[in-house]
Amino acid sequence: MFVRARCSATLIASLSISGIAFAQAPVAPTAEPTDTVVILGRGEPRQTQTVSGDALLTEAPGASPIKALEQLPGVFFTGADPFGSYEYASTLNLRGFAQTQLGFTLDGVPLGDMSYSNHNGLHISRAIISENVDRAQLAQGASDLDAASTSNLGGSLKFYSRDPGAVFGADIALSAGDDQHRRFFGRVDTGEFGVWGTRASLSYADSFTNVWTNNEGKQTSRQLNVKLVQPLGSDQEMSLWINASQRRENDYLEHSRQQIDRLGYFASYLQPDYQLAVLLADIANNVDEDGDGLSDWTGNAPTNPAAGAIFPSPYQSPDDAYYQGAGLRDDVIGALGWTGQLNDQLDFSLTAYSHTDKGQGPWFTPYVTSPNAYDPAATTDNAPLAFRGFSYDFTRWGGLGDIDFDLGQHQIEVGGWYESNKSDEGFRYFGLDRAQANRDSLEFQENPFYVDDQFAFSTETVKFYIQDTWRPFDALTLLFGFKGQRVSSEAAKRIEDNVIVAPGDEGYTFGEIKSEDWFLPQLGFSYRIDSDNEIFGSAGESLAAFASQSGGVNANGSQAAIDDAIATIEPERSRTFELGWRWQGMNLEALAAAYYVEFDNRLAAFFASDSPILVSEAIYRNVGSVRTRGVEATLYADLSDTLTALVSLSYNQSEYQDDVLRDDGTLEIATNGKTVAGAPEQLLKAELAYDDGNLFGGLSYSYSGEWFYTYENDNPVDAVSLLDLNIGYRFSEGLAEGAEISVNVSNLLDESYIAAWSGLVERDPDGDQQVLFVGSPRSAFVTLRKSF
């Protein structure tokens, strides 16, 4: 733990669980809202829980929809900000599987693996305004066959949006809080209009907050959601939704352990002290203990010898503090859907979608000089550092559909998914002036002076599934099915070291890689022993597609390295087995489950350079397997008409089964028998909630056990306990009827702790790997909400 000097206001975001209920039958994807949180998924042949969108309203204003899933067993979600919406430092782990090994959808539309520099989707925080989430469904382990994902090795999260209301209405919410946080949310529902019963909704959200570490960084988000529903008779309807997002975020700075101790818990970027950033870059370029005329830090020649070679205290390297970094994202995603019944025995669903994204990751880098840095007469583009923007854009479109046959005891479902994705990625460098910062990290930059390794990608995804849900008698449900998928990705280098290249040119590379398996089976059952007890079990297999992005398998280094990787590696694969018990009493619900997972063909990259900043080409290899064993238990108690309690406990033992070896047999990483990095073994969640219709509130406790950010487990991160609080009041009479005031406080006890990581590393015996984010301090927010 760390000692910090700030004392903030007191009040936090937590999930109020009043009104929690448990499903009596398999949860169906209806459009009707629910005011309950479904924990146990009664009747399902696998672990499935559904959380209502109302739960998000008790979280901090604008919190990520994933925040409402934190209380579920096996879920480890953490980040550097109190909202969980800052993507670079938000971390989701489910039963030992990382976020990029899970699947995510919104109204069935794929969101990709939700990685930060996403190549095939976007984060749910940008895909929809959090207040517009109707519900979120979590399927652990074998996941769902119908999930439109090719990364769901460890489970899937399906989000569903609120439909427009049948009557006219409006919602307005205003929020304010620590770090100058302010947020507006507004939504208008037209109600049914016209002779066809059309209904629509329009929503807008505008958020601003300062970065809590130094209050100089700024984070803004603007989102627009439009949805239209058109009934077609009594048993069919069409829907159209379009969601736009503009996000401008200054970064939180990751640190090493020794940097946190030396620089302090609140250490961050240098902005607005640009001259200090220039000085640190000059000094870094002057350090030359090797005596070869080039910097030991940057590899550059000296840019200002008069600056000397001694860093001013407390700084000891150019990596201790950069001037600024940011993430810029513009997204537009939309879908047209048609669902309904063709007859009493035949249901169908069809969806067409598209998504465009433009992104840039600005960073004031001291490792590259501006083009005129060595010209003493220059007054522009003459700084000893440069503005680097990792830039990318993509356009993807696709369609998915399913058809359900009700054949009495058998429910047959057949579905498919197709997607085409065209993208472009590259590192682009822009000049900076020595006298002042002439570029804004929160604005897209154009006309670079240098472009390094720009790639064009083309990816095609095809997937289908078929399943039979058989109920031979009322107490027994059996599920049989399988899915098949093929993902083919081409990557062609367009620019090599600032030179446009084409086939036949030196430096040009091309790689096509496929992941394909047309039989990935899944089995499951649920058996109701009596009115109170039920057992369930499942087994399933999943395959992950290769990520198609810069530095990936087919877009990395030389043609020889790409050809070697394509010929050598296999896609990652998981096999999950699960057995559980559900119990339902008068005022109690309970769940116990055990699972076992075989995760094979784990993929890793070896780098010839040890520099975390300037990376040479990678060598990709499958490096062995992971075996996971775990148990989960959940208890819900309805203590009175107004008071409820929830406790969940998870134990997950995920271990590497092999050491990582290089091609010549030498040891690279000693991982055999080590715990999987980034996954705590113990998780404990507890919540107590009160709601009498007017006064409401909740106190939430979470314990995350020790975890590792190194593969060799040589530097553990301490366990942490956190408390969150929410309290509010609904007005039900007079002019204030329909109004609500609430207060949220995150990290109530103001704990200092390491929360997340930007990357996992081989080992860190000296604590100098700069990959850790500290957690946000106590933060308080007040929200006024009015419904009309």
Residue ranges and their predicted role:
Residues 30-167, 579:
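Acidic, small-polar-rich N-terminal luminal/periplasmic segments of exported/outer-membrane proteins
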Residues 229, 237-333, 362-388, 437-449:
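Acidic/polar loop-and-plug regions of large Gram-negative outer-membrane beta-barrel proteins
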Residues 543, 600, 645, 702-709, ...:
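C-terminal beta-signal and adjacent terminal beta-strands/loops
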